[in-house]
Amino acid sequence: MANTKEIQKRMKSIQDTMKITNAMYMISSSKLRVAKQKLEDTEPYFYSLQMAISRFLRHIPDTESRYFDQKTEIPDAEKRRGYIVITADKGLAGAYNHNVIKMAHELFEQGNNNKLFVVGELGRQYFAKEGLEVDTEFKYTVQNPSLHRARVITDRVMELYDKGELDEVYIVYTKMENAFNMNAEKIQLLPLKKEDFMRAPIDTYQEEIKVEPSMEAILEHVVPNCVTGIIYGSLVESFASEQKDRKSTRLNSSHTRGSR
């Protein structure tokens, strides 16, 4: 039977661990609030970009652009797809990394001409271990999502899309459905789908617009910014999901320690 000194030592060890866990829990809570605020602050701007595209397409629905070209002439099995995969830089985040990596791996193996663009150290390590080539890895991004970092990712995938080296681009990230549920999610970034932009409210004012210098020139500017907005939103939402998962993991750890 343990003597009194051993019991006291054990109790102090548990208390010290709980203090550390509680401190980490508070840090995760703070980061979660900051991430949510960042997203809320930028949503109006990117919403206005989507509305601008919607207005153009309502007035010129027959517009032809590579940004809306679904390339139906290419068999689905032969399409070259790019997958931007958002993971964490470190573990101890519950199922957060497992779910998004599992989805990305399954999607990547569905074709022979796919490219991976990885955000987060754990994703890079996983795909390297599996022997899957990563086209581009983006460092120092997941712990500090910003518009600049989102634009860097956009520039790379837009470059390959404009060159014709990619037919479709997707982003795989973690969406926080509510305070309790998070799911791995896939969004198609390119090409854009016209039907996603042409659902106008019934009371929308059908004003006349004049497009100068051309619709394509306008889309050259607006579409990359729109894609950047989606990527940025995905980065922030993934970051918020990661912090939420860490918060839950540390809270459970603290409760487990306290019950011993």
Regions found by a protein language model. Give the residues of each.
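Conserved small/polar residues in nucleotide/adenosyl-binding loops
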Residues: 249-254, 258-260
